[in-house]
Each structure stands twice: as C-alpha cells, then as structure tokens.
Amino acid sequence: MDSGLSTPQLPITNMNNEITTDWDKAMNLIMTCVSGHIHSRMFNIVMKLNICDILEDGPKSIKQVSDTIGMDENSCFRLLRYFVAHELFSEDKSNIGTFEKTSISTMFSSKGKLRPMGERYTHDLHYKMFESLPETFANGHSNATKSVGVNHFWELFDLHPQYKDLFNQTMKVYTEAAISNITQSKGIDFSQYDTVVDIGGNHGLLIGNLLEIYPTIKHGINFDLDVVINSSDQTLRYSHPRLTHIPGNFFESVPESDCYIMKFILHDWPTQDCVKILKTISKSMKPNAKIHLFEIIIDPRKGYSKYETYIDILMFQMVNAKERTLDEWKELFELADFKLERVVDDIKTGCMVVSKK
C-alpha cells in the first residue's frame, strides 16, 4: 500500500536546464509555490544564525559551521545542502562536507544589500501574518495584523522596533534599486521646480539624490511619520544642506510645494484612503504643481510578472491594498479630482505624473 510518502518523478530538464513538459512544469510548481512555506522557514534559519556571514571569510567544514551555530552536524549538513541545491552556497566537490560562499550568499551577509529583505520577509511576524491568507481570499478582506496583536500594519512599529528597523532598511533597498532608473530617466526633469517634497520618503535617500543631481532645486523636503524619520537607526538618514526632514501625517497635512514625489506609497492603502491622501496633498499644492507617482502599473496586455503579482498579494494581506492597472489608477485620480497628465515610459517601476483638475 502506498504510504503517501513515495517520491513522485521530479522535473526533467534538458542540457540548458530548461523545464520541458507540462508534467515537469507542474512538478516545478510543487517545488516552488506549493512548498514555498518550507523555503521561507529554511531561509529564516539561515538569517537567524548568520550563516552567510560565517562563510564570508573562506570555506568551512561542516564541523566548523555546526560548532559556530550550535547545531548538530547532521542537521547542519542538511541545512547547507538544501541551499547548495538553491545556489545560495556551494560545496567543494573534491572535499564533500566543506561549504563556501557564493556571490548570492554575499548579498545576504550582514554587509550585503539584500540582508534586510531576507530578514524581514522570513521574519516570524511576517510569517505569522500570512497564516490567515486563505481566510483573506474567502472574506475579501484581511485581518492578518490581528494575529500579531495590532489593528493595522503600521502599529507594528511601536511594538516591534526591530521589525520597524528591518522595514526601513528594506525600503532603503527598494529605493537604491530604483534611484538610477529615476535619476537617469529622459522623461522626467525636476530642474523646473523650486521645492520638491518626497511624501513617505523614509530617510530621504531619493530626494537627497535628486538634490545632488538638480542644483536648481532650492529646497528638498523628506516628509514621513515621526516613527520613521526619528527611528532608532539615524545612520540611515540622508544629509544634504538643502534637505529638511519633516515628520507628519499625510492624512492631516503636507508641506506646501510645486512638486511632490511618492514612491510606492499609494499601493499601501485602499482606494478610499488613497483619495484622502491625494485630497490632503491637493490643499498644499501651489498653482500648476505636479505629483510624480512611482507605482506599479499592471498591464494585462503585456502579461503578469511574478514581481507585480507577488507585491499585489503582499499588499492585500498586510494592508488591504493592491497594485493597479492604468484604468484603475485613472478611476482613483478621478475620485480625488486629479487628472493623469502622462505615463513616463522609461521608468521600470512605473511612473505617472498627475495634477489637479
């Protein structure tokens, strides 16, 4: 009798490591999507035990690694072997049981750019919030944050300062990844503006870089919550003689300006809240002022990317928000008495310039 534990045939690939048949594609789905929770928990172990750091200064035997992290050798070997298969680490084929870093694992070391993302997205709090994902789809509304003792995602920061720091560091990673594309865009010119306000700008990295590139901008303002701007890690705050950091709440008021930028802000909020945010900004906009929105624009005609759909579910579960198509963005702007002036095509993350009607 089959115990249910027998091993099905795993994906077969050709010489180029390409999955070739429907069966192989289905089995690959098992190894990625269906078993995703296992990947997440395994990666959580690697992050907690700083294994990427341990291998940074050279190859280590399994005994050296296990002694360092306080894990028995058999378990440690199976953990590292798992991630050799996922190309995070490599094993010396001439000396089995000796492991070394890869260029990928370096990115997740303490000095690596992706370390904050690796820690945050496998964090116990993050994992706990996603246990109720089936209920979210059944109800059309997420109560995920209640499982971690808060009514709204943003309240987590007061209760869990370490998670808040990880969030801020993760936002810095996203901003760094987008900066070169934004600053090199031929479709945007900030030289025409006297004051530029980055709403929800975290620690001012984007607006700071714009001030470096555009000396004609007289004043840059980084506007975010007090808990973000005055976070425990002040080393993240960007410093520039023309940059001011102002704490506040964009549901209440924002600084007056002739240009606003918002990067991945509105996708954090349900439509009715997005309308409130835009109407708050509207009250402070100088004549002919513009808002540059850096947001994902889903285009069904081009097909759905894994990144866009992943972020959409992330927003759904954590903050009851979503990613939007261009038509959905236009509907939102209409509700807030704004108009879409243009889409900036050479911004990979998506960029829309809007103004008041």
Swiss-Prot record:
Its EC number is 2.1.1.-. It holds the Pfam family Methyltransf_2. PROSITE patterns: SAM_OMT_II. It comes from the Eukaryota. SUPFAM superfamilies: S-adenosyl-L-methionine-dependent methyltransferases (SSF53335), Winged helix' DNA-binding domain (SSF46785). The lineage of its organism: Eukaryota, Amoebozoa, Evosea, Eumycetozoa, Dictyostelia. S-adenosyl-L-methionine binds at residues 200, 224, 249-250, 263. Belongs to the class I-like SAM-binding methyltransferase superfamily. Cation-independent O-methyltransferase family. COMT subfamily. This is O-methyltransferase 9. It catalyses: (3,5-dichloro-2,4,6-trihydroxyphenyl)hexan-1-one + S-adenosyl-L-methionine = 1-(3,5-dichloro-2,6-dihydroxy-4-methoxyphenyl)hexan-1-one + S-adenosyl-L-homocysteine + H(+). InterPro entries: COMT-like, O_MeTrfase_dom, Plant_O-MeTrfase_dimerisation, SAM-dependent_MTases_sf, WH-like_DNA-bd_sf, WH_DNA-bd_sf. The gene is omt9. Keywords: Methyltransferase, S-adenosyl-L-methionine, Transferase. GO terms for molecular function: 3,5-dichloro-THPH methyl transferase activity; O-methyltransferase activity; protein dimerization activity; S-adenosylmethionine-dependent methyltransferase activity. It comes from Dictyostelium discoideum (Social amoeba).
